[in-house]
């Protein structure tokens, strides 16, 4: 599949803003290993092969195991994830699939049990940012590894 256009060259100003948002997510309170997991899960849900690939590679660089990476897609049925990671993955799914059910109260309660108010805002910003990246990459058919 060929990319439809190079969005970095097509709108440098817009991409500068996206890069600034991405940089911000790295400075928030969510640990890098968890950020990679939520980026992978949101990218899977959005059908973004480019971002799923990129963040899986990043996760391995941070020491993530292949076994856990393979299980992200079925995290609910896997014992590989901590309560904090499970809460973050549930929150990621709810925020990513917002139009389906908004964010259910039980998902919010699970997230609040694991994250402070500030951390939950930070997590939501990270989920929002990866969703924006996914929409760019999917819309313009950015190929994995490219």
Language-model segments: residues:
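Hydrophobic alpha-helical segments
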Residues: 1-146
